[in-house]
């Protein structure tokens, strides 16, 4: 199980632990991941995802899982979240934006 948010792609960061005497040692800053069950109104079922607490706030702010996934870019989403996004688009009837060749 990876330590990466399925909706926002937040992952571990690397930094220093700094002691009182200013000695720096390497450490990892892990994202605050929680297992959350979201309700998809379009799919009419519960969806369990491992997301960061920041993503939970973002989903609530955007008006639910369906609205969040429809607005989210495909780059940040996990493969499982991408499948959900496509299923919601198919159910709702929203077409994905077409990229123009330049």
Curated annotation (Swiss-Prot):
Alphabetical keyword list: Ribonucleoprotein, Ribosomal protein
Molecular function terms, GO-annotated: structural constituent of ribosome
UniProt KW S-adenosyl-L-methionine keyword: no
SUPFAM superfamilies per the UniProt record, alphabetical: L28p-like
UniProt-listed GO biological process terms: translation
GO CC annotation: cytosolic large ribosomal subunit
Coiled coil location: none
Domain of life: Bacteria
Similarity section: Belongs to the bacterial ribosomal protein bL28 family.
Protein name per its UniProtKB record: Large ribosomal subunit protein bL28
Source organism (scientific name): Bradyrhizobium diazoefficiens (strain JCM 10833 / BCRC 13528 / IAM 13628 / NBRC 14792 / USDA 110)
Gene encoding the protein: rpmB
């Amino acid at each position: 199980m990876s330590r990466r948010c399925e909706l926002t792609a937040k992952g571990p960061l690397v930094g220093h632990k700094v002691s009182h005497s200013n000695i720096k040692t390497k450490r990892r800053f892990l994202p605050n991941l929680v297992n959350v069950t979201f309700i998809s109104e379009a799919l009419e079922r519960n969806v369990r995802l491992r997301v960061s607490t920041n993503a939970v706030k973002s989903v609530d702010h955007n008006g639910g899982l369906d609205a969040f996934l429809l607005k989210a870019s495909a780059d940040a989403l996990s493969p499982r979240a991408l499948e959900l996004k496509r299923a919601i688009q198919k159910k709702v009837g929203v077409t994905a934006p077409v990229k123009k060749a330049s």
